[in-house]
Amino acid sequence: MRKIVVLFVVAFCLLSTGMRAQHTFVHKQSSTYEWPEDSLVLKKLDQWRDLKFGVIFHWGLYAVPGIVESWALCSEDVDWISRYGHNNYQEFKDWYWNGLSKQFNPTEFEPAQWAEVTKQAGMKYMIFTTKHHDGFCMFDSQYTDFSISRCAFKEHPKADVAKYVFEAFRKEGFMTGAYFSKPDWHNQDYWWDYFATPNRNVNYKIERHPEKWEAFKTYTHNQIGELMSNYGTIDILWLDGGWVSPRNNQDIDMPQIAAMARAKQPGLLVVDRTIHGKYENYQT
């Protein structure tokens, strides 16, 4: 059985590579690179470069219906976003946010098996999705009730899923990373239900409602602080949602986030995905 799982992982990686080649999902690489100045970050980066092969886990509410992460919540007309039988956008959002959290109950969750299988496949570092764009936390955040530890899975002894995932992989010698979505479509200070949600971006004018944006920044900083404080050694902070950036007038203060995170996790690699520069220690 273990050999079958390993073969499945390898096959999935090869299939994913083929899909990317066909649909050009690969993000453009920067022609320049800004080297970190912190000696501890440079040391960690050298260690990471030697690992060569890693795995990223996307796991969340979207696993219940088996859809493409949380992207169906986004009202954008592209081929890879489908609502699978739901014709009404608002009904879909209600079903996703209010229905799936009542169904997501992975009682056979066993992260030690994940770690064992990926180690057998030769992988040496991992990234785990602590929160995707839908805002559903796979860790026990004190700043929202929209999390795995407050929903159908809350009575399980491993309800704080991220904690046990990171522990299992550290035990097998992996470098561990926390994926975290900068946008949060469930948060009223990002997608405010006073307005429609026409696309992936914040749906109000920040210059007209600066207090809401400040509240969202605080929420984001607090949740990242939890991950950096309560989950043992974290080697990589992998930030997704590149449209949340100063170039789009969505500045969440990356200098402060990086400084806070590295104060708690010295040598931390920061990957502000697709935002080339000081806070993209490696590109994906």
What are these regions (language model features)?
Residues 1-24:
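Bacterial Sec-dependent N-terminal signal peptides
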Residues 22-284:
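Mature catalytic domains of secreted/periplasmic carbohydrate-active enzymes
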